[in-house]
């Protein structure tokens, strides 16, 4: 998807797929070149050509390329994960981030314990000031999680479960 490049005489991907004549005013042509047939097929399957046409008509022209890029990405993810789509990918990344922050905090704490440095002198979370500030408020052993437990591993596992939609 390259935007507003001069068109060749061939039809755009949308008109090819929909088996219609591509006109000079085709709203799909600048965004779905004839070589983007698979991309348009995915967008059409998930959103429908009529809905995409209406959406592109409502979006300012300078934002249409980004709109098409977003639709193509969302269609791709929705076809891979029909139930959760992008939300499932976001939840998975958030879970991974929490696991890595936890692992980093544990590793730094162990490193400090083995180095003989007093824990009050150095924070194991120097690179994560937001998390460090939160954990400094409450001792780790007394940390109450959102689900009411103190078991961080179980909590991280629960975060990894797909969200209820």
UniProtKB/Swiss-Prot annotation:
Q: Which Pfam families match?
A: LOB (PF03195)
Q: Which residues form the LOB domain?
A: 10-111
Q: List, alphabetically, the PROSITE patterns matched.
A: LOB
| Family, as annotated | Belongs to the LOB domain-containing protein family.
What is this protein called in UniProt?
A: LOB domain-containing protein 21
Q: Which organism is it from?
A: Arabidopsis thaliana (Mouse-ear cress)
The encoding gene: LBD21
């Amino acid at each position: 998807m390259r935007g507003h490049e001069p068109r060749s005489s061939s039809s755009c991907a949308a008109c090819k797929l929909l088996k219609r004549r591509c006109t000079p005013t085709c709203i799909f042509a600048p965004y779905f070149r004839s070589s983007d047939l698979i991309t348009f097929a995915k967008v059409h399957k998930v959103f429908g050509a009529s809905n995409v046409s209406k959406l592109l008509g409502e979006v300012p022209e300078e934002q249409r390329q980004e709109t098409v890029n977003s639709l193509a990405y969302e269609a791709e993810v929705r076809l891979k994960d029909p139930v959760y789509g992008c939300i499932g990918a976001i939840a998975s990344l958030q879970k991974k981030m929490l696991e890595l922050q936890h692992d980093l905090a544990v590793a730094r704490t162990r490193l400090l314990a083995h180095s003989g440095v007093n824990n009050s002198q150095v924070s194991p979370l120097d690179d994560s000031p937001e998390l460090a500030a939160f954990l400094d408020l409450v001792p780790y052993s007394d940390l109450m999680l959102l689900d009411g437990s103190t078991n961080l591993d179980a909590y991280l596992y629960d975060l990894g479960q797909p969200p209820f939609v």
